[in-house]
Structures are given as structure tokens and as C-alpha cells.
Amino acid sequence: MTLAELIGNIRCEAITGDINMDREIRTGYTSDLLSDAIANIEEDSVWITMQRHINILGVAKLKDVVAIVIPRSLQVEQSVIDKAREEGIAILRGSQTAFEISALIYNALR
């Protein structure tokens, strides 16, 4: 499934624009601990996290994630959005909880 298809399935917005829309997603990972994310996120994943600071971009780049998904319509600072665009990292935002987004992604990828 591509990122564009996933966005339609889980009803979220791409706050960084059309970055990575054609990339294939293999799996997902949910964690708010950066060290846990670094240790466990697989390549070609989407990462669901409530963290919204600049360091999430370093983790996403290191692990080559397709997108970061922010739950509960939480706001992301413009400086983080701008840096994500510069680095080619997609950030999505959904109104659902992290649990609900995880379930939607899991079911969409099955």
C-alpha cells in the first residue's frame, strides 16, 4: 500500500504536503520513546507517535520511515514541518488516538 492510499484509508492529513506519496508501506510501529523507536522501527514503516519535536525527524531519517503519524490532531510546530519538508520526511496528522490509528493501519495493511 502506498502512503497516498493509506491517507485515504485512515482519514488523516499530510501536513508536509505530497512527500513520499508513492512510497510503499510494509508495516507500522507505535512508540513515544525515541530509543525504542530507533531499536525497533523497520524500514518502510509508518511511525505513530505523540512526540512532535525536531528529534523525531532524526529518528525517521535514520530508520528510513515512510511517514510519521501524529494522533489526536496534535499541533506540530512550523519549524518541525519546514525541516521535515527539507529532509523529505512526510508527517501526517489524524484526529484519532494512537491506538485507533494503529488499528486502522494494521487493518489496512492486512
Regions found by a protein language model. Give the residues of each.
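Absolute protein N-terminus
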Residues: 1-2, 110
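N-terminal first-folded block
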Residues: 3-45
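Feature captures the catalytic cores and cofactor-binding loops of soluble hydro-lyases/lyases
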Residues: 23, 32-46, 50-110
